[in-house]
């Protein structure tokens, strides 16, 4: 019988993490399960930095961005000796299970802990939408709205100055956020990790667009592919058109979660407690075809990688 659980947020924060925390805490307390909030991710687990969470701590979290528990990237957690110290703290606090909110890196840590005897449930919280075993992650749709709003504003000024704009979008090594934002924002050119980047080919496409009479355009590109400022200089030199690069950066992680993320966070938090009550462990939660599902974390990490939406990219190219 589960009497006490711990909850933490790990890695890059995303809008809706607080909504997950609220859902987990309220559902757990309704089943007479105590909840320990673990601060600053796995670093807090290592440092034994925990606090009992009550209704009053989470009552107003549904619409708040960020995470009240704090987050961090604690690379030392990859070391077994570090995890053993964290596990000692878990046993000292008499925690029966951990709920871990984050991305694939957080899932890997959850899998390690499960294999070392600490039952874990993973909930996907990241704007990158790159987590195994789910169509969407909590925070993705809020970030999408943020990026599309930025693209719309760039479109206004690019049109005024007959300028080429390059906008760098987060996503790590997944192009989902860039692709969806580019389609919704009407970007003429899309550069994502799933397609081999060829600078000369991109230039050729831009030159064709100029010959068609297009006086301005926007290039949407996922981070880590190239230096966008250098790319802007290259395009300007070759096309003789003013070209500017904009790096959106961490603004994409902030803001109040949109309705879909709030709903998804609430559903996943409830489902996590239901899984624990049924005796499940070593699971990750996802949403597939709008149905909340769960998978073995180890299986999901190895066999359920995100599928690239190539058909979506190919279809949108027909517009331009």
UniProtKB/Swiss-Prot annotation:
Catalytic activity line of the entry: beta-D-fructose 6-phosphate + ATP = beta-D-fructose 1,6-bisphosphate + ADP + H(+)
Pfam family, one: PFK
PROSITE patterns: PHOSPHOFRUCTOKINASE
Residues the entry annotates as binding substrate: 126-128, 163, 170-172, 223, 244, 250-253
EC number: 2.7.1.11
Class of enzymatic activity (EC top level): transferase
Active site: 128
UniProt subunit comment: Homotetramer.
Family of the protein in this entry: Belongs to the phosphofructokinase type A (PFKA) family. ATP-dependent PFK group I subfamily. Prokaryotic clade 'B1' sub-subfamily.
This protein's name: ATP-dependent 6-phosphofructokinase
Organism encoding this protein: Buchnera aphidicola subsp. Cinara cedri (strain Cc)
